[in-house]
Amino acid sequence: MSDISDANKLKHRFRGYFPVVIDVETAGFNSQTDALLEIAVTLLKMDDEGLLGIDKTLHFNIEPFEGANLEPEALAFNGIDPTNPLRGAVSEKEAFLEIFKAVKKAQKASDCHRSIIVAHNAAFDHGFVSKAIERCDLKRSPFHPFATFDTATLAGLAIGHTVLAKACIMAGIPFDNKEAHSALYDTERTAELFCHIVNRWKQLGGWPLLAAGESEDADGEE
């Protein structure tokens, strides 16, 4: 990076990775057997000052794949009725084709070379997303196959709490527990939390890093 304006570009902030915030609601914990029922995807943008913010969110209710397991306890927890026609559910393939299209467009606009999933307890969401992509036999996924940014871990470090609701409140982000466990609501709160942590780190002087030459110059100053 040649100057601060370069450091304030999204393509330089995460080594060319474009962060995509995702939340899923499912019919259980097993990504191989349990249905993916809902997914929301929040795309981010960076302003001229290098501050990260929400761009837009996509949301889909998903039809359970053929033969999917539906755990009653999971459905009771998230309140989803997979048989309700008012859900307007689409197939996994239809949803992910739209997601791929939007993510790749935003990734290209930011001059990034790949996207990386951001999620709260990211291994869970990444597992369900990866398995759905595999089931649909979709090629050229924009997402890194294993790397993620986990906001539970980041919040534990930066804020001192790993629970999404608690971390948001401690960060000054309103959180309504009555709206929680909706993929749309949780994704946008997760996105706000991720942006807060990234921006706070910048405001505290953690980014951009000083180049080696700049560091030596600073050490020599009285």
Curated annotation (Swiss-Prot):
One of its GO terms (cellular component) is cytosol. It is an enzyme of class 3 (hydrolase). One of its GO terms (biological process) is DNA replication proofreading. It holds the Pfam family RNase_T. One of its GO terms (molecular function) is RNA exonuclease activity, producing 5'-phosphomonoesters. It comes from the Bacteria. Its cofactor is Mg(2+). This is Ribonuclease T. It comes from Shewanella sp. (strain ANA-3).
